[in-house]
Amino acid sequence: MSGLRISLDDLESDSDDSAQMTHQVLRLGEITVSAEGLTTSMGYKYGLSPDDVVVSATGFLGQGSSGSVRRATHRKTGEALALKEIKITSQAHLQEIRRELETLHREGNNSPYLVGFYGAFCHEGSVFIAMECMDGSLASVRKPVPTEVLASIARSILRGLWDLHRNRHLIHRDLKPSNILFSLDGRIKISDFGVSSFLECTRANAHSFVGTLTYMSPERLKGESYSFAADIWSFGLVVAELALGRCPFTEKLARANSSTEAGFWVLLQHLSSDGPVIVLPPTMDSALADFISACIQKDSQSRPTCEELLQHPFITNAMKDDDKHVIKEWLLLMAMQAELIPSSAERETPLMTQSGATASLNLDDELSKLVR
């Protein structure tokens, strides 16, 4: 394993005693992370160390809000992991690590709609977080997504958000397609909690400015206080992007010439105007259009909650089949249309390896090629 070769004692600290660095040990509130793994103040321990994982040399999975993610394997069990490395170069990184670890520890193994958590450890100036390895993100799927499939995806995301909002009092603050993961068996899970924020009650508000600009709500762009409705805005834009096949603000942001500051002012000016947030095509399913419009109301108080959205006709009128089944069948159809796997008639003839030996069809491998 590789990492930034620095001593944690060399880093600057601030007055926040909840995040302390001593040699290769991090004390983050109720959580302590060392080379031997993660422990909590309540005595819970995740026994995971650098020697327990084998990192794939070619398994780069993506870039999160605060670090890179690679595919790895647990040495003893052979289980696939997504290993996120966060190089510690500032006190701000420690706060991100604390937020993510606290959320993963408390929620990652308690909800089927949040990515699972296996442990964390320190190594050579970095913190490594081991999570459930999914097969791709919504940023990588072919778009536009069919309406009935989109309803199943949206329902799964809403159930994850509902768990964060109602049961955990957490605002995700960085909901976007790349932070919503899927597995080839049709599961949808929310990930990347490095900028999430805890609210003591459901009527509280947050104030800090973090997250991805494109999916940020008007109240957040304006520097106003915000609450769970900010996530609903981001969710609405994610659904719109999957339905339209592109980010709704792509053309407007193109004028910013890749400048974050210019993009900020372009979006702020657009969302402060009297015009519509986005113009949906008249051919769009009416229930879907109404669903998206409800999520992206400029007035945060006018946006529905997750619970209310789960009762919207776009969701309730969708196919009653199991959401996992609907999503899995869609992934299979995409693969077949891309001719990455043979049709049912062709499957009667065994596939051949380069050496001429008979091989079985590995559907998961073929689907993985499609979405990467």
Regions from the PLM with identified roles:
Residues 120:
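Activation-segment/catalytic-loop signature of the eukaryotic protein kinase fold
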Residues 58-64, 69:
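Protein kinase glycine-rich loop
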Residues 85-109:
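Conserved N-lobe beta3->alphaC-helix segment of eukaryotic protein kinase catalytic domains
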Residues 231:
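Conserved catalytic-loop aspartate of Hanks-type protein kinases
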Residues 153-154:
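Activation segment signature within eukaryotic-like protein kinase domains
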Residues 124-137:
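Conserved short submotifs of the Hanks-type protein kinase catalytic core
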